[in-house]
Design a protein with these regions (language model features):
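Active-site rim/loop-helix segments in enzyme catalytic domains that contact anionic ligands
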Residues: 1-58, 187, 198-199
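Metal-dependent de-N-acetylase/amidase catalytic core
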Residues: 45-201
Length: 201
């Protein structure tokens, strides 16, 4: 949504490079940034329409977005903005154009939210055992934000020495709850269903 220009550490240009590196680690084929104003974007018509254009462009069945309740004010704002845009994107009477072409309405089937700073109770857990190192390597691409004893920039809560350990340990603990090595938790605005009880672990 933003380029993180208000971040205490690093610059938007550094963040662009870090994002590209993280995308490569994860095998992401396409990454776009809407360039909203960091800290000041709103969940309003102007911003919703820009998100709707992206939803209609890619037609995702599942959308993952920020935590609904979090320390950083942009995270819940982003969560509400994307969630609302996902609903509105399905309304035929909302007209949008991209590259001069009229877009068709599209509503994702599900919107799920990450667990970020706060230890929110997950609505479901995904077994990520075997992928935990890829996750951590992708996160470490954003090195300007994390612990660096040589850095001259101000310390933040996520630049403390043990921060990355807390991320790894959370996936260990969530994995423990479902009997696997590592798990990732998500929250949902609606009840999550499965096609078969055999899908549950």
């Amino acid at each position: 949504l933003t380029r993180g220009e208000l971040g205490t550490r690093g610059t938007p240009e550094i963040r662009d490079q870090e994002s590209a590196s993280a995308a490569e680690v994860m095998g992401v084929k396409i990454r776009e940034n809407l360039g909203f104003k960091d800290g000041f974007f709103q969940n309003d018509e102007e911003h919703q329409l820009e998100v709707i254009k992206i939803i209609r462009k890619y037609k995702p069945k599942i959308v993952l977005c920020n935590a609904k309740d979090d320390r950083h004010i942009d995270h819940p704002k982003g969560a509400d903005l994307v969630s609302d845009a996902c609903f509105l994107s399905g309304l035929e009477k909302i007209k949008t154009k991209l590259d001069g072409k009229t877009q068709q309405s599209w509503r994702p089937l599900n919107v799920y939210h990450y667990i970020q700073w706060k230890n929110s109770s997950p609505d479901f857990l995904v077994d990520i055992s075997g992928f935990e190192n890829i996750k951590m390597n992708a996160i470490k691409c954003y090195s300007s934000q994390f612990y660096d004893p040589k850095s001259k920039e101000s310390e933040t809560l996520i630049s403390k020495k043990n921060f990355l350990d807390t991320i790894f340990n959370r996936s260990l603990d969530l994995g423990r709850l479902i009997g696997v090595d590592h798990a990732e938790g998500f929250t949902s605005n609606k009840i999550v269903g499965v096609e078969s009880i055999n899908d549950l672990i």
